């Protein structure tokens, strides 16, 4: 499971610089994980070349697309409500076309197109280059569908437009799909098997971002640490690669060092990591380069060995704790965040207490916590009874959230009195006189604007904090400028 992008970003319409020669209008919304938001940038780029300018006004759109998430039932219900809204607008504008992209497209294709007849086209995550052809089908009065999962597609040849309108931070996709087959997760079924993008196309995209003034990139994938380029194809087929392909293959450690060394004045983040793929050699690269951010998102899902086995997680509690110890030893200033699921099938009170005790051991900086939501098509959905009562799930989730809040306070207070480097990203929501940005550990920092500007790297002395935000005074520009 990849962490859901900030709630404030959910459903945000993507608006880009318009081309004067384009005559059609595209309204596109994104929900779910960062990969969906990155994919929407690819889609907007493809359709910009096809004559579409973006709009934030739903009612004036010729084409409405929603990039969807299937990770939890709540996400699907939110998107269904949006589809109802689109169709209400469509009744007054029959020429408007409505399409579903992403993970729900693959899972509910027949239901959307044939049974409910609420959309005109359904396009899976690997079929976005086919959008112009599919739209031509729709213009001819036919429904259009392409949800074929690819063994090769990485969109490495598409130059994405940028969702992050601050012009400072950007997402760079490096892998697609996942091979892990966790029993609760739909990603392998909706996004296909794991494959990696050619390193030079990644470097070229980052160079383009640097030339445009971007200051920070996030290397993105469902499982970035398992990145492996050996000339193309699925990761699982690497065993059949030639000796030359194996000798010249590039793994995540090498890619991360390549990016950090190639762009020393650009901040590098990455997400998401799976514990079994976070090798010690990667930690040494993180420690070696000051421009690699000292934050590791390390989903664990449960602290119980029995539940981890039921989830088909490829690590034990003890292996996870040993990895935490390595991180603390090699990258002592790293922040660590988590994903946690409360109420997985058969979870007992003892299992839940194991989760809480693991949290006490790690004391995460922040986390993404959910109650279990049965997803059709997953192994858990097919084979396991959702037998934990909703009230019990809610109570256990609240205990996890409360403990995380306690640890977040503890970790925030560790920064008070210290000086941190902050990349200014925007004006603070709470005060127009303050800037907001993040430090290397991905913690939000606010400080008075003074004469600084968005895009500056500023040294800030932390004077106070809340559980989620650090507050301080600027000391001057950092050496990253």
Can you name each region flagged by the protein language model?
Residues 30, 310, 367, 447-448:
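Thr-Gly-centered strand-to-loop micro-motif
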Residues 164-168, 178-180, 292, 302, ...:
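Short flexible coil/turn linkers enriched for glycine and charged/polar residues
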Residues 29, 101, 220-222, 271-273, ...:
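Generic beta-strand/beta-sheet core signal
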Residues 182, 202, 219, 270, ...:
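Conserved, mostly hydrophobic/aromatic
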Residues 12, 380-481:
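Terminal RNA-binding accessory module
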Residues 186, 233-242, 381-386:
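Short glycine/proline- and charge-enriched loop/turn segments
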Residues 1-227, 251, 318-329, 353-361, ...:
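Proteins enriched for Cys/Gly/acidic motifs involved in redox and nucleic-acid/cofactor modification
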Residues 98-102, 107, 211-350, 360:
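Conserved SAM/AdoMet-binding glycine-rich loop
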